[in-house]
């Protein structure tokens, strides 16, 4: 295991620590300038798209083909955007997609993105399933430990996403800020607790974070099911673990 990218990282609190000790936030651990450490080659869209092989029948997975016309989305959630991503229920780009389209990240403007809002938690402080997760609210009314996580493809020719994006509210003004960009080959994603819609994110620096989906109750199970199918497609699940669960 190589040396950590950021030597000033603090270790998470040991099991049994008092609930008054706050879990380190992703935005505190991951510095806001990830582009100095990770270089992603962006392929410009071709004049014509190559003919891709038909994906295996998967009941509407997150295959990132740029076919025209409506297709079943993840979990049968209606139509999808170009690239096979599940379309927003309102028909408008979601928060992370709008942020990337604001002009600061021109290379990501046309990337199809699948994203969701999560709340970071520590299983030692908020053990599941005996206690609920209480978001940390700032003076600006924003959820301090909220994390917007999305996956994207750096090329329209890819059938699956190859980038993981992490964003959260800035401490200064509460506006969304991109603080993590990682190739998916350097990240491991697991289902931590399916019943509570919780994911485990393990970086190549051996740091592990836990995220719980923050979505309306009526759409939460369907949205989390999309992430489960994505994880299954990416083959990040351990063969020795219980299906869809990382012990």
Curated annotation (Swiss-Prot):
GO aspect biological process, one term: defense response to virus
Cellular compartments per GO CC: Golgi apparatus
The keyword Protein transport is assigned to this record: no
Pfam family, one: GARIL_Rab2_bd
Predominant location: Golgi
Region spans: Disordered: 1-22, 60-92
Localisation: Golgi apparatus
Keywords recorded for this protein, A-Z: Golgi apparatus
InterPro entries named in the record: GARIL-like_Rab2B-bd
Compositional bias (Pro residues): 1-16
Subunit structure: Interacts (via N-terminus) with RAB2B (in GTP-bound form).
Family (UniProt): Belongs to the GARIN family.
Annotated protein name in UniProt: Golgi-associated RAB2 interactor protein 5A
